[in-house]
């Protein structure tokens, strides 16, 4: 048998022409094949290009069953923490999130800070600043074509999407007709995936549908007159290329891109063939992918040319040829006009859900925020330079927008708290001056007197300052033991220590008062030990007293018994809750009718023993259970919120961030909401909620702390420091994009003018410039530390790492210094009040107690 085979082989060799050379390679084992991580195109039919014939569309797949998995060592906890910290700060070398941030930054600059440099635009191939999109700045990667296709003629693919396929020279001239690329072999570049999605990645698993998405889909189905189930089960039967929601992570439609809806049937035109961001639609499930892989290979369904009349009826346009504009001189000869024959391929596998209707879809459509060119950039007419480095270009293209969750949550909390505060505490008199109320009120002496109550007006249309302090406003006496307030309270207690009960001769009543205030002709001042009713303590008469309606001899709870006898000092006496003898003790200070009890008035801990009518008229806190001012803690009543751990030492330090969620009135809240829905929301889409939340809260806390140091006796509410900290982020964003802006100095002076205007506006009452200044400085440090930005080379990357450490240390030093000044070394600055309020009139700033005079 072997001899016969050798004879046949030799005969064939004799018949072979001398010029013919046969080179038959030996069969190699499957394991020796070069691994390829591309899936077979025949199985994933939804990846087939419209320009590639089915019989030539084959890409080798790896023999996974013949390859052993590569064993890798598990990453240590230290490496994981280091890599995560580097990714979060934006200094990682191979981080996908860092690349996304950097590629998005330039796009943000183009809308916020003005035009870009011409070289930047030429690098990005963006002739227009109007539509700077993610997909328009991408060039799809070359497709691998097998050896059998290398000899095929290249075709023109008019379906390539995006502005990235325009000719660079034409883009510089501002022309708008797209340049049609030439694809390798018969494979279409745009039919597989973009450079961001990557053909080497598998489709992602579907996310769970949210309630809002299902509700909108049901509403859209009802509007179209069909059941929700029918709309859900409906799926596309014919498709010419991959849906964008299958492979692309984040794409955005723009007017200059091709409307791809002509590939589907007319009945499902508005439901199945829209390409919108990934957060609106979902990716196929793993079960669907397995069904696609297990499905038998089907014959390709190739259709003829599309009917032009049908497309016109559907209001669609099929690009059949290149543009008809005038070509640039010296350009290549125009290629012949070829009408493209479209293929339709069947898609297998179930699909969950249904895409929402067009009106609802347009409602949720949002544009990308180019780095440095956000809302403020559009207002100040900023643009990129005409040329940007390719490394910077890749950083911008990989950036994604974030959802402004923190802005929405903050706006909701601000609105809710403001509405509740106005409903519960009411609205104070509106204006810029003082509001005086005069009335005749019964006082502690038993006669009516004309008294005047002076209230600060609030032009923000909101509660009074006392109500704001009770809600949690920034107020230094509630956050620490203020030296002046503490000395004022100690002086009042010293006067009360030498007081006694003044009993009127007509037995109309009695009140605790000093000897000067008690009439010697109409009343008797019962003073121990002069008065015969003085009790004894340790064998001798008490030296201080008496106290109206309180005596250690008749009090049962708490009783004055050895070893728990009441002290000599009456200011240290407890509140007696039960007397044993009632009103018949034969002691004048016990048998009289008391007409005055402690009342806390004002915001500085001032206490008066007066009648309830007078206390209510002065908007004070009346204590029916006490007889002395030393038995009550007025600062605890004034501050409200959680009680002090030590009643003598205020400790509500949490007012530093609690006041960020309060507002002085309705207008104040509306101003904050406008700022948040414009500037804050725009920046959060760039940096994410976690970075913006850190900068917002820490800037506000630092600003309130500085305000509490220099303006300790002024109630301050609102996120003034936080808002200036967010404005500092705009400056940092401008500095980081300085090299790619066409006119950076113009953008800088515009931002500086806005900040100076707001600072000048802070010279009016109720607006704190100390919070503005400190919040801006702290926000500047935090922005340099926490906001990732574009890096212009390896040296710039190392510089940012040093910058993060330096600015974090500087901010911590600033915060520590303010804490030391606030708690350990209080500062009294007389001229500092002129930085936050200029007294244009005598009472313009006096009503806000900037002189810190206690009364």
Curated annotation (Swiss-Prot):
Keywords, sorted A to Z: Endoplasmic reticulum, Glycoprotein, Golgi apparatus, Growth factor binding, Membrane, Phosphoprotein, Protein transport, Transmembrane, Transmembrane helix, Transport
Annotated Gene3D superfamilies: Rhomboid-like
Family annotation (InterPro entries): Inactive_Rhomboid, iRhom1_2_N, Peptidase_S54_rhomboid_dom, Rhomboid-like_sf
Transmembrane stretches, start-end: 412-432, 656-676, 692-712, 715-735, 747-767, 773-793, 804-824
Classification lineage: Eukaryota, Metazoa, Chordata, Craniata, Vertebrata
Family: Belongs to the peptidase S54 family.
GO cellular component: endoplasmic reticulum membrane; Golgi membrane
Descriptive protein name: Inactive rhomboid protein 1
Region named Disordered: 1-36
